[in-house]
Amino acid sequence: MTGTLGQDTTNQICGSYDAVLEKSPNVEVVFEGAGNWGATDAAPLAENWLASGKEIDAIVCNNDGMALGVVPVLKSAGKSEQIKVYGLDATNEGLKAVDSGEMAATIYVDSKAEIEKAFEMLEDLKAGKKVDAEYKVPSVLVTKENVKEYMK
């Protein structure tokens, strides 16, 4: 489930997912649709997917807000145990849902490390040093096993 179609953030996240899927031939994407970053649009989209009768093993969302919109849909359909829900951002609500088992996982993006690296690169540029055009700060998959480390 994507964010708003055409937005840079949606494109970046989906591009990363697509790169992983290319290396995963056993994974079949059954549905893709825009949940527009929130539960309000995510819930009816998930309802439509479930109503199709197609087999769904997981719903992977571009953020925790959409994932949290999917959770009650699965509960009311009695599918919480069969269909795993994944989010991104490791919000407080998302982390609580992982801890309770409502979500299988979320991805922690270290914004502080990103900002620190951006300022480091800025200082290097100001000093006349060459910097890479892109730098990736590692993300962490947060599951039931490590969620307590990320909860506030």
Tell me the role of every PLM-derived stretch.
Residues 1-152:
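A residue-level marker of the well-folded mature domains of exported/periplasmic proteins
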